[in-house]
Amino acid sequence: MMDPIHQFNIETIFTIGHIGGQEIAFTNSSAYMLVAVVLTSLLMLATGRKLVPGRMQSIAEISYEFVADTIHTTAGKDGMKFFPFVFTIFMLVTVSNLVGIVPYTFTISSHIIVTAALAFLVFFTVLIYGFYKNGLRFFKLFVPSGIPIVILPLVVAIEVISFLSRPVSHSVRLFANMLAGHITLKVFASFVTMLGAMGIVGVFGAVLPLALVVALTALELLVAFLQAYVFTILTCIYINDAIHPGH
């Protein structure tokens, strides 16, 4: 059976240079990040503004309205200033997840370093804007109202730990789901290949694994959208905390 982890290997395409003895390389991960950006840009540029929208325009409009509604629902009118930021994250995660389902491609969201970078970007955006807008009142985020004074220190400590752990949970959720799904697909696809190579008997035996591969691929499509949605709505919730701490 082929190694199911091999698909996640980061391989150097060409070396850009060295800084402090550290190689700076353009990798397959970098290439598929670029692919995700290009595909997203083409989707936005090729839509047009027809009165009767075509498929591409409909996809772009649905994506736009979905993100706008999500921000407005979770963060209110003030949250709309973050629309470009949230929309960019949503489209990047969605497109990269979908590209990764195509055989022999690379799933950038299956690497913790990528999801962690996005999660920390959200975390520091919330932190910086929270203090910029609210000053020291941002600390109200850690002091829930209506808590008895006796247990307040414990609650504050829990809230601080919860806040600091956000980048971890935010990144691991996306990374783990994409990693597990693609490993499962690879394992069953390998079964199909192995059984198919055994002749006519093996071909019949490969029917069930093949059916599972088709079903799992459909499930992965759902997971690709679902994880992009979860990552986006958590981003909006965290932004709401920066805008309205203590609410």
Curated annotation (Swiss-Prot):
<dbReference type="InterPro" id="IPR000568">
    <property type="entry name" value="ATP_synth_F0_asu"/>
</dbReference>
<keyword id="KW-0138">CF(0)</keyword>
<comment type="subunit">
    <text>F-type ATPases have 2 components, CF(1) - the catalytic core - and CF(0) - the membrane proton channel. CF(1) has five subunits: alpha(3), beta(3), gamma(1), delta(1), epsilon(1). CF(0) has three main subunits: a(1), b(2) and c(9-12). The alpha and beta chains form an alternating ring which encloses part of the gamma chain. CF(1) is attached to CF(0) by a central stalk formed by the gamma and epsilon chains, while a peripheral stalk is formed by the delta and b chains.</text>
</comment>
<keyword id="KW-1133">Transmembrane helix</keyword>
<keyword id="KW-0472">Membrane</keyword>
<dbReference type="InterPro" id="IPR023011">
    <property type="entry name" value="ATP_synth_F0_asu_AS"/>
</dbReference>
<feature type="transmembrane region" description="Helical">
    <location>
        <begin position="24"/>
        <end position="44"/>
    </location>
</feature>
<feature type="transmembrane region" description="Helical">
    <location>
        <begin position="219"/>
        <end position="239"/>
    </location>
</feature>
<feature type="transmembrane region" description="Helical">
    <location>
        <begin position="112"/>
        <end position="132"/>
    </location>
</feature>
<feature type="transmembrane region" description="Helical">
    <location>
        <begin position="194"/>
        <end position="214"/>
    </location>
</feature>
<feature type="transmembrane region" description="Helical">
    <location>
        <begin position="82"/>
        <end position="102"/>
    </location>
</feature>
<protein>
    <recommendedName>
        <fullName>ATP synthase subunit a</fullName>
    </recommendedName>
</protein>
<dbReference type="GO" id="GO:0045259">
    <property type="term" value="C:proton-transporting ATP synthase complex"/>
</dbReference>
<dbReference type="Pfam" id="PF00119">
    <property type="entry name" value="ATP-synt_A"/>
</dbReference>
<keyword id="KW-0997">Cell inner membrane</keyword>
<dbReference type="GO" id="GO:0046933">
    <property type="term" value="F:proton-transporting ATP synthase activity, rotational mechanism"/>
</dbReference>
<keyword id="KW-0066">ATP synthesis</keyword>
<keyword id="KW-1003">Cell membrane</keyword>
<dbReference type="GO" id="GO:0005886">
    <property type="term" value="C:plasma membrane"/>
</dbReference>
<dbReference type="InterPro" id="IPR045083">
    <property type="entry name" value="ATP_synth_F0_asu_bact/mt"/>
</dbReference>
<comment type="function">
    <text>Key component of the proton channel; it plays a direct role in the translocation of protons across the membrane.</text>
</comment>
<keyword id="KW-0406">Ion transport</keyword>
<keyword id="KW-0812">Transmembrane</keyword>
<keyword id="KW-0813">Transport</keyword>
<feature type="transmembrane region" description="Helical">
    <location>
        <begin position="141"/>
        <end position="161"/>
    </location>
</feature>
<comment type="similarity">
    <text>Belongs to the ATPase A chain family.</text>
</comment>
<dbReference type="InterPro" id="IPR035908">
    <property type="entry name" value="F0_ATP_A_sf"/>
</dbReference>
<keyword id="KW-0375">Hydrogen ion transport</keyword>
